[in-house]
Amino acid sequence: MEANNQKKLEYPFSNRPKDGELLNVKGGIHWLRMPLPIALNHINLWLIEGNNGFTIIDSGMSTDEAKGIWRNIFNEFVSPKKVEKILITHMHLDHSGLAGWLSSELNIDPHFTQKEHNETQKIIGCLLYTSPSPRD
């Protein structure tokens, strides 16, 4: 349906991965549909295969289900030793929630922009150095 002369959104892929599954988009680009326990029921994550290993783009939300999906991927698709980088596009919890866990599991540091780092430091500072709001 078109409204206000806007075209309907068209998706470039007829096939979509099921929750927790990888779909090879093209070459070394793999699409991971990670389920979320909120109204937005999934997030799209990516594994990009390079010459020397894989880059994970975004981690998903910190849930036991998401950790299980990552463990399954490491057991069936890519050895943890083959992961070179973890890139976090932004610090929303659905994109960055498992960055620390993945970093620990893979023994590599996650990367994100300086702006996201600065904003996260501000939030942490507010949480650590301000009094909680009084409750009624």
Language-model-derived ranges and their functions:
Residues 1-12:
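N-terminal presequences and immediately downstream first alpha-helices
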Residues 11-17, 21:
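Short glycine- and acidic-rich boundary segments immediately preceding or forming the N-terminal edge
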Residues 19-81:
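Conserved beta-strand hairpin/beta-sheet module of binuclear metal-dependent hydrolase folds
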Residues 61, 93, 136:
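Short, glycine/acidic-enriched loop or turn micro-motifs at the edges of active sites
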Residues 66-113:
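Active-site metal-binding motif and surrounding structural segment of the metallo-beta-lactamase
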Residues 89, 125-128:
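Long, mid-chain structured domain cores
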Residues 118-123:
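A short beta-to-alpha transition loop/helix N-cap that caps and shapes the active-site region
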Residues 129-134:
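Conserved small/polar residues in nucleotide/adenosyl-binding loops
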